Design a protein with these regions (language model features):
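Bacterial N-terminal signal peptides that target proteins for export
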Residues: 1-8
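Non-catalytic, surface beta->alpha helical segment in thiol-disulfide oxidoreductase systems
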Residues: 281-284, 290-312
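Oxidative protein folding and maturation machinery
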Residues: 21-190
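Short active-site neighborhood of thiol/selenol oxidoreductases, capturing the structured segment around
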Residues: 193-221, 237-239
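Short, glycine-anchored, charge-dense loop/turn motifs used at functional sites
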Residues: 189, 211, 288-294
Length: 312
């Protein structure tokens, strides 16, 4: 199924929604109960709420109020349910993180009345919030889903093994926590550690040589003026790490990396074997501050550049 990811800007979306909600709420209860799967009925936002922030928060908290998650017919109408989920994930970005996480957990808990519905909604969460190829990927939004799955009474214990493992990995190196230390080795054989590096910012770049996305990211970082400036001013260190075994391939591609970067590899494969960092998506970028606290996790080169421009 193809879903529509070209969603209106949230300001227009929220300002126009009162009219749509009002029309939906004017339907008779009989119409809604008889036809719950032909349309998705949004909650009516109180007219007293005029600020976009207020309207977004109300909508996030009450988005699914008109959905009966015990009705398994929703599973068979992805053009309604999946599109509603995509729109919901977009709105989550316009409320505080804590509000978004509480709303997601409440939503998933509500689906915990039926195993099929629970599996369907959590699969949607996996598709849009966890899949490395999803433009809406957001680990902080996905964590409440994993927590709900681990605590669910409709899932067998064997089914909970994967979400529990994912939850454990997702809770490592979260924004606001200290990044996990590790040792790296240079082509010369010299070694160092993450915690030994001293600068206002540290950009950890975990990558594989020759991968298309890695090459694009390297070019994006090289062409970002703010990154070049901060490296020159010794306020930023870029630590590029190869986590795998094919060292010959890594050495062949070393000339693609700027000499100003620290280019190393994980000699004992500790990052991968002990799952110190989530490697489901390669490349992956972490921006750390002087204390090695994570500022950005699994970010794009553009997001790194924008953050540094604002906070330099």
């Amino acid at each position: 199924m193809k879903t529509n990811l070209n969603i209106l800007p949230i300001l227009c979306f929220l300002l126009l929604w009162s009219c749509k909600s009002g029309n939906a709420s004017s339907q008779t209860k009989n119409e809604v109960s008889q036809d719950t799967i032909k349309t998705f009925t949004l909650p009516a936002i109180p007219q007293i709420m005029v600020a976009p922030e207020q309207r977004a928060e109300f909508l996030v908290k009450h988005y699914w109020d008109n959905v009966n998650f015990a009705d398994t017919n929703y599973i068979h109408h992805p053009e309604i349910t999946e599109q509603a989920w995509v729109d919901y994930c977009d709105i989550l970005n316009h409320v505080p993180l804590k509000t978004a996480q509480e709303a997601i957990r409440k939503t998933i808990d509500r689906t915990n009345v039926d195993k099929k519905v629970f599996a369907y909604i959590t699969d949607l969460a996996d598709k849009y919030l966890y899949d490395p190829n999803s433009p809406m990927r957001n680990e902080e939004f996905y964590i409440p889903v994993l927590e709900a799955m681990a605590a669910s009474h409709v899932l067998e214990e064997i089914v909970k093994v994967r979400p529990k493992a994912r939850l454990e990995l997702a809770q490592k190196n979260r924004i606001g926590t200290k990044a996990i230390n590790f040792t790296y080795t240079l082509a010369s054989g010299a070694q160092g550690s993450l915690y030994q590096l001293n600068a206002d910012y540290l950009l950890l770049f975990i990558n594989n040589p020759g991968c298309h996305a890695c090459t694009e990211t390297i070019e994006g970082l090289k062409q970002a003026p703010i990154i070049s400036q901060l490296i020159k001013e010794k306020k930023l260190i870029v630590l590029s790490i190869y986590p795998d075994e094919e060292l010959d391939d890594w050495r062949k591609h070393l000339n693609e990396f700027p000499k100003e970067w620290i280019n190393g590899y994980d000699k004992k494969f500790t990052i991968k074997e002990k799952q110190l960092y989530d490697l489901k998506a390669i490349p992956t970028l972490y921006l750390l501050n002087k204390e090695k606290t994570v500022l950005l996790k699994d970010a794009t080169a553009q997001a790194i550049e924008e953050y540094l421009m604002i906070h330099q």
